[in-house]
Amino acid sequence: MNVPLLSIRDLSIDFKSDVGAFRAVDGLSFDVPKGKTVALVGESGSGKSVTAQAILRILPKVARIGGGSILFDDPANDEPPLDIATLDPEGETIRALRGGRIAMIFQEPMTSLSPLHTVGDQVSEALLLHGDVSKAEALDSAVDVFARVGFPDPKRALVTYPFELSGGLRQRAMIAMALITRPALLIADEPTTALDVTTQAQILDLMRELQGEAQMSLLLITHDLGVVANMADHVVVMYRGRVVEAGPREDLFRRAQHPYLKALMRAVPRFAMAPGERLTPIREVKSAILARRTEAAQARPEPKGPVLAAADLCKSFTLRAGWFSGRTRKIHAVNGVSLQLARGKTLGLVGESGCGKTTVSKMIMRALQPDSGTVTFDDGAGPRDVFALEGDDLKAYRRAVQFVFQDPFSSLNPRMTVYEILTEPLRIHEIGTSDDRFERAKQLLEMVGLDRRYLRRYPHSFSGGQRQRLGIARALALEPRVLLCDEPVSALDVSVQAQILNLLKDLQSALGLSYLFVSHNLAVVDYIADTIAVMCRGYIVEEAPKVTLFRNPVHPYTQALLAAVPDPDIDRPLDFAKLKTDRFSDPAQWPEPFRLVGGEFGAMTEIESGHRVRVTRATEREAA
């Protein structure tokens, strides 16, 4: 008889609250076979992460296991399966399992790693706690595991702090910490949600490789069906604390039965959606958008050309090599970026983390001063240099160009009510009376599909999707022409993401807004954008209408980005072998005529109407 590594039966988890007990997980049952990957799928709040916490017995104090069993059959010994649900959460038995035989990769590596200790100390500590080794042996093992998970300089990683690492390297450090003890079960809770698409593909490939080497079982918690299609052997779908469908990956993707799973699949943005086709969220948001522009906004003159244009923007940052050395090095974050945003259209700006996307948006907002280049804004009276604006003109520009932030949890002041959040921009710009502002706040809530009775609530009482709608409402308060959207849906699960994307489209159609939409998710950008600019290492490397770009990508970096997107179609798997060999983000490794070396910017050249690609200067001269 083949006993599963982990067998959960009739698990219930209860939370205490002021109004009584709440059952977050109800009668959950599933198995994790030895050496296999099981994906636990569902929206935020479905009980996925709480289940993982119960397996490790790290539930919050207000929660308890209300019933059921969690049987763990450790292949390292001949003992009968151990029921984790009956163990003392503070006892020696669970402490030996936790981080030793059962390890976990958490969703946000920056908050999971201590900022006060080097990653070398944190990774080696796991082995010191669970293995009979000396400090020197633990550090040697840490170097080995850093090399295995892809650190470019494993020895230097020993003395590196988390804040010195990119998001991808932080997640690799978390994987190293989990794997150094060679666990039998690895629980990965949304391990790639915060990562860009190429880094995500690398992390997924790394997890597959390491799982095969160690014959480890993987419990993958995610809401990304593209990741599930490329990683899972078995899938368990949760909704409101219960399993609604479970089975082999191929059965669920080809023959989904439950309406919830079918709805989850319809909410995922897909490439080549038909013009005008909408995402189908699990729960529709009814908003009252039409006829909400004021008379003053309707009377504004419209620009004849681009509403916003950037030309040859450059920005560099000087970093110190150490506190006392005095040595510095210059980082070129943005190199000759030129963009044009048409009225009522969406320009998608895509690329990996650190490529300069957010720096460009900050310069457009005048939060950063460029080293060179210009940004012009046309409010209907002709283009004006944004960096020359002062006084009332600058205030008018800030009113016309608003920002929607990435993180809906940290971008709203927790000490302000919804009414105060929505009316603060009106108060700062001295718009309307107190009664006018109150009416405007109610209108804004209705526009984003929230009840006007929420005005006296605080941000903590809202879900992530509701908070992001509040962020959009705040950005709309001053009736802007342009919204700069910096990864506005990356922190949201797929069904809430569909609500926000549909809302942004509806607002644009009704209010004539222009969007600069910054994202690393190409499927999302394909859904919402009209034109797409691809950015790498501070350069715009390709720009085209979205249909052209996805049908005929020319630049090798664009091709690599598209190849790294996990598709929720099991007939279109990721080519992990090709992704591993590509040096797609290094301009010096690009083939001719795209290669950029020695600080060369190259030049954008048009290869068909509206389709531009960056090539070397020599190639451009030959073409001329």
Residue ranges and their predicted role:
Residues 69-96, 134, 205, 374-396, ...:
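ABC ATPase NBD Q-loop/coupling interface
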Residues 137-156, 381-382, 436-453:
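Conserved ABC ATPase "signature" region
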Residues 243-247, 255, 540-544:
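ABC ATPase "signature
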Residues 99, 163, 180-181, 460, ...:
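Conserved signature/switch motifs of ABC ATPase nucleotide-binding domains
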Residues 180-184, 477-481, 497:
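A short, proline-enriched helix->beta-strand linker immediately N-terminal to the Walker B motif
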Residues 160-165, 169, 458-462, 466:
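Conserved ABC ATPase signature
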Residues 77-83, 249-307, 320-325, 546-623:
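Charged, flexible cofactor/metal-binding loops and thiol motifs
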Residues 173, 178-179, 470, 476:
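ABC ATPase C-loop
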